[in-house]
Amino acid sequence: MQLKLKNHKANIFEQLPFDSSKKSIVFLPGAGMDHRILSMFNLEELHNGHNILGFDLPGHGFTSGPIVNSIDEHSLFCIDVFDQLDIKEPILIGHSWGGLVALDLSTKVEHDMTICMNIAYPFLVGDMLLDFAKGNLDQAVEFLMKYGIHKFPKTEIKTKGFGTMGSGFYGRKKGQIKSPYGTKVVEDDPEREIKLYPLKRLFNQSEKEISSIDLKSCNSFRLTEEQISGLKNIKYIFSEKDKLARFNPENMLLQNVNHDEDIIILEDVGHFPYFESPEETNKALISIIKK
């Protein structure tokens, strides 16, 4: 659905038609991604009692309007959507950068639950990745694949188009692959490139520097001590082999958390568990929400 907000025309993807009588589950994608992340999840068990929504944040997907540069501004955009749809006490699910937006939102609105997947805090992004994201997004995505992917899924992921942004990501010419962000030769391991396509395509955006903008906002995002101590109804999903957002049991966010009940560590997966091990990821989310 398309919503006309004060400063944006917001695109909200619905897995089923929105029903105001149902509790809403809101997905907030990672840096440079959009609503198409929902193509990686199967949450049919939750359809009867829940709306499952994927937000295109400013500069992402099909949301139009001014780019915003901070986690806080993205949270305010989400609040505008909640107000227009009259969404009360949502279940927030954010992956990576989107997990920071979800965390910040949980300090601003009443929420039934917030699930932060694969986040670090502070979430510090290195200069090399920032430079790649600014100059050649294809290099940045390759960096994320190199350090973020631990294994490929057992079953090949069948992707849906989700509109024009899901098609034509690569153009081939004389053994090279041309993406919107650069040209490279993949003759050494073309099968790897094909296997990664369902995930890589999610970074294809009309706003070519949006990943850079998102990643910079990770570095500057901080909660106050009062906000951290006041966090409630927060659940965390980490990945055993995640090199981009490593689980640290001593992290300040986790000091007042019941580690047995509120933290799940997915085994043998990296930073993108919904790609690497979708069934286990779906089971984890459903078990948390149904508990």
Segments from the language model and where they lie:
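Catalytic histidine-centered segment of alpha/beta-hydrolase-like enzymes
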Residues: 244, 269-282
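Conserved alpha/beta-hydrolase "nucleophile elbow" surrounding the catalytic nucleophile
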Residues: 29-31, 90, 94-96, 239
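Conserved HGGG/HGGXW glycine-rich cap/lid loop of the alpha/beta-hydrolase fold
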Residues: 8-64
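Active-site loop/oxyanion-hole signature of alpha/beta-hydrolase fold enzymes
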Residues: 8, 47, 51-93, 97, ...
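Conserved hydrolase catalytic core segment
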Residues: 88-125
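Conserved loop-alpha-helix segment in the C-terminal half of the alpha/beta-hydrolase fold
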Residues: 44, 230-269
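Conserved alpha/beta-hydrolase catalytic His-Asp/Glu region
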Residues: 131-230
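N-terminal cap/lid segment of alpha/beta-hydrolase-fold proteins
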Residues: 1-9
